[in-house]
Amino acid sequence: MEDLTPTNTSLDTTTTNNDTTSDREAAPTTLNLTPTASESENSLSPVTAEDLIAKSIKEGCPKRTSNDFMFLQSMGEGAYSQVFRCREVATDAMFAVKVLQKSYLNRHQKMDAIIREKNILTYLSQECGGHPFVTQLYTHFHDQARIYFVIGLVENGDLGESLCHFGSFDMLTSKFFASEILTGLQFLHDNKIVHRDMKPDNVLIQKDGHILITDFGSAQAFGGLQLSQEGFTDANQASSRSSDSGSPPPTRFYSDEEVPEENTARRTTFVGTALYVSPEMLADGDVGPQTDIWGLGCILFQCLAGQPPFRAVNQYHLLKRIQELDFSFPEGFPEEASEIIAKILVRDPSTRITSQELMAHKFFENVDWVNIANIKPPVLHAYIPATFGEPEYYSNIGPVEPGLDDRALFRLMNLGNDASASQPSTFRPSNVEHRGDPFVSEIAPRANSEAEKNRAARAQKLEEQRVKNPFHIFTNNSLILKQGYLEKKRGLFARRRMFLLTEGPHLLYIDVPNLVLKGEVPWTPCMQVELKNSGTFFIHTPNRVYYLFDLEKKADEWCKAINDVRKRYSVTIEKTFNSAMRDGTFGSIYGKKKSRKEMMREQKALRRKQEKEEKKALKAEQVSKKLSMQMDKKSP
């Protein structure tokens, strides 16, 4: 069997001094961005977005309108923006275009924030020369209704999606991501920009495996940096640095009078994502580069452990834990990583380790900071760390990228190049005529009497299940084929769940103490079950890898049962898939897994609908009673 355990080749060619005393800072790092031989050989290839962005950095943002781009596909949307995959008409280069509605921005007082984001992106790209690990702006423009930001296209998803898919990473991969994020943050901080919303979702993974820090909607200047205040007017659709403009670039300067040298931070109000927000932001205090370092520490913790350091049942308790620094390292957490994270997750930002000290820390001693943009990134594998007395395991199934796009469909299912791209998630086919399973004899009968016997036998088993099995309420009246407790692992954490393999097919997992259906493993044509040992097995799906452990050491029975059911329902699964591809409902069936917030919002909407219907029914009942009483009075 092929050993796919990653080798230590990605980060170590140069060793830095591991002296990390607080009074010594690492020397400034200059990246070596010289093209490799393979890059030079491709100089005659068609123009790319990277070429055009590099040209715009030198010559200024080109003047464009929405008619200069073909809007091909929506890639996602936020509270007040939507991102599209677009092709520039003149060059055929592919870009991502972020579109914002002016009416929404004005109605919710967000216009100033978007102007600031535009000016920060322009400043980082046009004046600072851009950075390989930071989103670079190609151009921006606006019309009467919308604002457009044109940036480089990244189709490999983000770090948050990869963490959702794989659960956690090994030390080598975690260190790789942390080192590249730190390099990108160093560029921002050297140019007096603080991101203020560092989280896995804002770290994109490029096609070559390197990262890209994105989403500067919460970013701010600090240290006296004065950015252009230019808003969205007809005049600024053309770059101030373009060849047809004689005006100089926006001036930046540092005001020592306004911001003293010893106080380079600025006051702020709470923005960002609660899981990764720093204590100083919660206290409405001074925010500077150390706020981003806090976010980096939370990301590194999650890469290794599988969960963020601060978790709670609700936001109130979550923020309280952050303020009180209430977190702990789970069993099995690497000691070398816990030491550096303990220096990052410090309440007082003035005593928090700095980016320069981080680069010089022994944790990063094998990182070649100068050539980091040219190293080969590690391949992402399904991996479970050593914990609970079990060794670490790497998947022996060939490494694949998270997500289900055209390439993944072609690779997994040989569907061809016309497959629609979408994000994967749970597959819930409606119950169809049962095709048989390994536990119920329902092979197509030769006589009506046999069919009646099979139906009667199934009905009897279903009735016994309804009466005796407390988990029947979760099955939608489907027969349970196999059930049992499994430890569902995610990094260094595990939760005991009751798993139900039922007709349909469905593979459900239940939180037994609270009697709550927590989720369902998706059934897709490319589903794979991998047995690791007598107790551990993996289930590979487009959305994520499930790491499961059977305390009874009967993992092989689970693998066989799941594979048997998958084979028997293969026609149903493939039929549903093909129908979704043909009808354009692929996204709704295999769509991106809903967040807890989205599910809660849907539940509230459902409750409101039910309450409205109940009130309507009550009102109708009252009207009916009133009419009945009136009729009774009129009757002799």
UniProtKB/Swiss-Prot annotation:
Bias category Basic and acidic residues: which stretches? 597-624
Binding of ATP occurs at A79, Y80, S81, K98, G152, L153, V154, D158, D201, D215
Composition bias, Low complexity: 1-20, 27-37
Write down the CDD domains for this protein, in alphabetical order.
PH_PDK1, STKc_PDK1
Q: Which residues form a coiled coil?
A: 550-631
* Keywords on record: ATP-binding, Coiled coil, Cytoplasm, Developmental protein, Kinase, Nucleotide-binding, Serine/threonine-protein kinase, Transferase
Domain called Protein kinase: residue spans? 69-364
Any one GO molecular-function label of the UniProt entry = protein serine kinase activity
Q: Where is this region: Disordered?
A: 1-45, 233-264, 593-636
- Give the record's GO CC terms: axon; cytoplasm; neuronal cell body; nucleus
Q: Name one GO biological process term.
A: dauer larval development
Residue ranges for the region (PIF-pocket) are 100-149
Query: Where is this protein primarily located?
Result: cytoplasm
Q: Where does this polypeptide localize?
A: Cytoplasm
Spell out the SUPFAM superfamilies in the cross-references.
Answer: PH domain-like, Protein kinase-like (PK-like)
Q: What is its EC number?
A: 2.7.11.1
Q: Where is the active site?
A: D197 (proton acceptor)
Q: What is the effect of changing G297R?
A: In sa680; developmental arrest at dauer stage, extended life span, increased body size, low fertility, and defects in egg-laying and social behavior. Fails to avoid NaCl after exposure to NaCl under starvation conditions
Catalytic reaction equation(s): L-seryl-[protein] + ATP = O-phospho-L-seryl-[protein] + ADP + H(+); L-threonyl-[protein] + ATP = O-phospho-L-threonyl-[protein] + ADP + H(+)
Function, as annotated, reads: Involved in the daf-2/insulin receptor-like transduction pathway, which controls longevity and prevents developmental arrest at the dauer stage. Phosphorylates and activates sgk-1, akt-1 and akt-2.
> What protein family is recorded?
Belongs to the protein kinase superfamily. AGC Ser/Thr protein kinase family. PDPK1 subfamily.
Domain description from the entry?
The PIF-pocket is a small lobe in the catalytic domain required by the enzyme for the binding to the hydrophobic motif of its substrates. It is an allosteric regulatory site that can accommodate small compounds acting as allosteric inhibitors.
Q: How is the subunit organization of this protein annotated in UniProt? A: Interacts directly with sgk-1, akt-1 and akt-2.
User: Can you say what this protein is called?
Assistant: 3-phosphoinositide-dependent protein kinase 1
Natural source organism: Caenorhabditis elegans
